[in-house]
Amino acid sequence: MNEKIELSLCDVLSLSKTPGERVTSLFELMQDHGQSFYDESVTQLEHALQAAHLAKTSHATMEQITAALLHDIGHFLMDEHDEQNHFLAEDWQHETVGAQQLAPFFGKAVTEPIFLHVPAKRYLCSVNADYFNGLSRASQRSYELQGGLMTDAEIAEFEQNPFHHTAVLLRRWDDGAKVKGLKVPDLQEYHTEVESCLEHS
């Protein structure tokens, strides 16, 4: 387990007796640990809610909406945020931490796009020369730390993943979810979707 993790999501969710309680515990964690700023525009929680809203208004599946809401859960768990001096100075692989912590409770339709949303940024930068210029300051800063341009072999490997299309969608929602002051539904809007995606009781 990554030594930077402040708390184990597995431990938190395992204490819940029902799927509904499990989602409530997850949302309480997000509420408690999501008030720090993701970048200069939005908090971690605001970013998650905006991403989920973009997914839902795009008529995404429940799994895609859940992945959008939880895609940065690794940042929540490792208390990564803009005010820390080391934030974006090193790559803590939040996508891997998040996917691993969610894997005991959600299927690959949720966890794999979360795992791939950072490679999806590298992929889009590699196949679309203009994509990088549209990224936020924080995403541009983290891009090189996360690997920079993909090789041809990495592009081919990414495209062979059955969830790569969803990962690209998630990346687009991620990029658009940084609007200061935007009013979107709160966490409870997504309780049904997230609970429906739980695979283990």
From Swiss-Prot:
Main EC class the enzyme belongs to: oxidoreductase
Annotated positions binding Fe cation 1: H47, H71, D72, D174
Domain of life: Bacteria
Catalytic activity, reaction form: hydroxymethylphosphonate + O2 = formate + phosphate + 2 H(+); (1R)-(2-amino-1-hydroxyethyl)phosphonate + O2 = glycine + phosphate + 2 H(+); (1R)-(1-hydroxyethyl)phosphonate + O2 = acetate + phosphate + 2 H(+)
Pfam families: HD (PF01966)
Keyword DNA-binding belongs to the record: no
Protein's UniProt keywords contain Metal-binding: yes
Entry keyword set: Iron, Metal-binding, Oxidoreductase
Stretches assigned to coiled coil: none
Annotated EC: 1.13.11.89
Alphabetized GO MF terms: metal ion binding; oxidoreductase activity
Gene3D superfamilies linked to this entry: Hypothetical protein af1432
Residues that coordinate or bind Fe cation 2: D72, H94, H117
Signal peptide span: none
Free-text remark on how the cofactor is bound: Binds 2 iron ions per subunit.
Listed cofactors: Fe(2+)
Function comment: Part of an oxidative pathway for utilization of methylphosphonic acid as a phosphate source. Catalyzes the oxidation of hydroxymethylphosphonic acid to produce formate and phosphate. Can also use (1R)-(2-amino-1-hydroxyethyl)phosphonic acid and (R)-1-hydroxyethylphosphonic acid with similar catalytic efficiency.
PANTHER family documented for this protein: HD DOMAIN-CONTAINING PROTEIN, PTHR40202
Protein name, per record: Hydroxymethylphosphonate dioxygenase
